[in-house]
């Protein structure tokens, strides 16, 4: 049975002190609550070790927002998957549309990141999604399937089964626009069908696919009610416990 997951992505927000306070506040808010999903927070690199040490990581998983596509060496400013794992983080977001757009991350680069994350015991949260022009041209299914195939389909079945996927229609990120629950379901089902064709139904049905793109307390319950939507990758709303908690409780 695949897991329901709500993962926050703080992006480039919060100083170390602010991030630590937010993580502790969320940890305290979840204590004693019965929740029906796994909770993850994706934080900037500088927060990882402090937050992993300060909260109950059986209650909240900690994720990096990126990792390098190289193992180690003379790559000034980069942070390796091994370094991320050494902080106590257990997850890493890979392939977010902002990384693809602003830092020109291609499928071959992302493939290396995924492999290094897996070899260091991290669970990748791999992001895919189309821009508005691609959707309006009717190419959204083709684009998203290609993103999955090019970066991930060299993995063997065992490694692929360790992944979490996140569908984020780029036109809905931070814009206030949201894919309808039916649009999200349609794409998630398409992704699952592509996985089944490559790895079989058992692997496809075991893969959690999250929705990312202006998901909030008002629309989370409807989105999460769809058969192939297994949770959310939450941006802005994850920066406030008051906004993040209702999304967690939408399951």
From Swiss-Prot:
Its EC number is 5.3.1.1. Keywords: Cytoplasm, Gluconeogenesis, Glycolysis, Isomerase. Pfam families: TIM (PF00121). GO terms for biological process: gluconeogenesis; glyceraldehyde-3-phosphate biosynthetic process; glycerol catabolic process; glycolytic process. GO terms for cellular component: cytosol. Substrate binds at residues 9-11, 174, 214, 235-236. Gene3D superfamilies: Aldolase class I. InterPro entries: Aldolase_TIM (IPR013785), TIM_sf (IPR035990), TrioseP_Isoase_bac/euk (IPR022896), Triosephosphate_isomerase (IPR000652), Triosephosphate_isomerase_AS (IPR020861). The active site is at 96 (electrophile), 168 (proton acceptor). Belongs to the triosephosphate isomerase family. Involved in the gluconeogenesis. Catalyzes stereospecifically the conversion of dihydroxyacetone phosphate (DHAP) to D-glyceraldehyde-3-phosphate (G3P). This is Triosephosphate isomerase. It comes from Porphyromonas gingivalis (strain ATCC 33277 / DSM 20709 / CIP 103683 / JCM 12257 / NCTC 11834 / 2561).
